[in-house]
């Protein structure tokens, strides 16, 4: 297939997406056959199609979010990419949970700079009850500012999510990271299903979910497509697209950095 023919195919098959429909399975497969090798004119066609879909669905507006590392390091999980894992020797900062006033002060500083969403992020699989209460107090303070109060605190129960929602939580962040099939290559201390259940629990609790993945860990294009479809089925409202920055001391320290074109292909997907 010539680049011109491929670009024409992309424009043709992407039209249903612009109008709000979903692609038929066969059309999706045809695009996924072309995307991994797309360059030049073909990749530009994919990018233009992605922009058209975005404009049709959510327009051109952008929001600015920021986070605070409220608790850092000493994590018991063994995620192969993470400098905060206690399983690996890295130079990641380590500190216990910040007190609520410091978290709120960090949020206020960001609000003055035009940030409209602020996330409280903590290392570890889940927070103990007393720390959860501290975060709830901080979220209440953040919610009083002209910004949305978000959090990323690991695997939480519906009761814990309800407590945070009552305190002012606007949305919850919990990445799936990769496909179900590739996940055991990246993490064995937590099941993929546990992560998926967090997304379900948020939906049952009426909490919008922000969930995406990390790319460049050695996953295949089939893994990337599977993750995208899983996130679609989970009904997430925002999908963070992260690219691996290999960190010395972690199992993925020697992974090559993704090329610019490969990063563009992933964003298009």
Give residue ranges: language-model regions:
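Flexible, acidic/Gly-rich N-terminal and inter-domain linker regions that tether
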Residues: 1-77, 81
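Structural motif corresponding to alpha-helix initiation and N-cap regions
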Residues: 40, 157-158, 221
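Short, catalytically relevant binding-site loops at active-site mouths
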Residues: 215-219, 245-248
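Conserved, mostly hydrophobic/aromatic
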Residues: 20, 50, 79, 120, ...
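Zinc-dependent deaminase catalytic domain
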Residues: 39-45, 226-238
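Short, well-ordered secondary-structure micro-motifs
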Residues: 131, 162, 185, 221-223, ...
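Radical SAM enzyme [4Fe-4S]-AdoMet core and its adjacent flexible, acidic
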Residues: 232-239, 243-269
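Core AdoMet radical
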Residues: 86-106, 110-202, 208-215, 237-242
């Amino acid at each position: 297939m010539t680049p011109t023919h491929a670009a024409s195919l992309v424009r043709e098959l992407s039209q249903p997406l612009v109008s709000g429909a979903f692609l038929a399975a066969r059309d999706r497969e045809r695009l996924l056959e072309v995307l991994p090798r797309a360059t030049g004119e073909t990749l530009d066609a994919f990018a233009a199609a992605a922009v058209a879909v975005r404009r049709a669905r959510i327009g051109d507006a952008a929001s600015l979010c920021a986070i605070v590392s409220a608790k850092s390091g000493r994590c018991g999980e063994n995620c192969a990419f993470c400098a905060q894992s206690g399983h690996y020797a890295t130079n990641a900062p380590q500190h216990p949970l910040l007190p609520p006033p410091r978290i709120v002060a960090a949020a206020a500083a960001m609000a003055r700079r035009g940030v409209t969403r602020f996330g409280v992020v903590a290392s570890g699989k889940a927070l103990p009850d007393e720390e959860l209460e501290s975060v709830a107090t901080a979220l209440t303070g953040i919610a009083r500012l002209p910004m949305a109060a978000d959090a990323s605190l690991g695997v939480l129960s519906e009761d814990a999510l309800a407590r945070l929602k009552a305190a002012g939580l606007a949305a919850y962040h919990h990445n799936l990271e990769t496909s179900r099939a590739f996940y055991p290559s990246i993490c064995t201390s937590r099941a993929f299903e546990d992560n998926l259940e967090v997304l379900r629990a948020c939906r049952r609790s009426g909490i919008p979910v922000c969930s995406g993945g990390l790319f460049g860990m050695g996953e295949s294009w089939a893994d990337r497509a599977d993750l995208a479809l899983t996130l679609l089925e989970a009904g997430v409202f925002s999908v963070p697209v992260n690219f691996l920055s290999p960190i010395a001391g972690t199992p993925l320290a020697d992974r090559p950095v993704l090329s610019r074109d490969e990063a563009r292909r992933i964003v298009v997907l």
